[in-house]
Amino acid sequence: RRHQNNRMSNHILKRPTLGANVLLLLVVAFIVVALNTRFWGIVFDSPGLAGLHGSGVIAAIAAALFALTLLMVLPLSLRWTFKPGLTLVLILAAGAAYFIGDYGAVIDRHALASVYETDAREAGEWLNLRMLLSIGALGLLPAAFVWWARVDWQQPTREIFSRLKLALLAFALLGVAALGFGKDVASLLRNHMELRHIANPFALLAANLSYLDHARNDNRPLAKVGLDARRGAALPPGDRPLVLVLAIGESMRAASLDLNGYARDTDFDLHPLPVVNFGKVSSCGTNTATSLPCMFSDLGRRGYDDATAKHRENVLDVLV
């Protein structure tokens, strides 16, 4: 009986053997379905997608997203990069899905700049149990399956040929989607501009490429401003340096401050202080990489451009 139980256990835990293309397609399908819940929520809630025609538009969007994701992971499908590459894609896509779903974030160049240019302390504030569980369930568990499954590798030439067929399949899906429902998809994207920034993991790749391209062209000379600035009479005389401390919370919503008329007592610690409240200030953006430099720029909210501001002095440079 013990021998029989061992055989049953081995049978239950038997590692599946899959072709490389099959495993690749399973991973792509999982990403498209499970790691794009907010994307699909917006699509399904969009008006005008009822009936047979609407189903066709949704199918075209699914085909296009599947094809783009497949084309993204195909370069990682060589034998020695196959499982590590899929693991990396799954974990990164799971992380992006968490921030897109739980924080309503969009994945663009500015969001990545906020991530890449932060410090360890601020990054640690994002870590929580919900985040770890989400990435574990949607990233690490599928990655564990990828490593657990055996891959039935064919001869190198046959593997290359099979990947080429997958690439042709992806381009065919894109072509059919564009020819059949291209105008409808374009209209949906115009009405919901955020879709292109939450299509996971395509948005992640596009944002990284944009960030790298922006950084590569980051060699313009620094434009000086406020050259006529002088030390004012109100400042104390002498050579001792004047220290100015700025505590900035650029992500605070002005509408949620009771100083601005909010019903709840949200900033009671400020009440005893001689606060000068500017209640009609608007941010240049919803991300740190844009809103924080804009606070100190002379370009103004309407004229602000992060590429220009990066090569232009601001009020802090003038004060120093």
Give residue ranges: language-model regions.
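Generic enzyme active-site microenvironment
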Residues: I248
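Short, Lys/Arg-enriched N-terminal segments with co-localized hydrophobic residues
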Residues: R1-S9
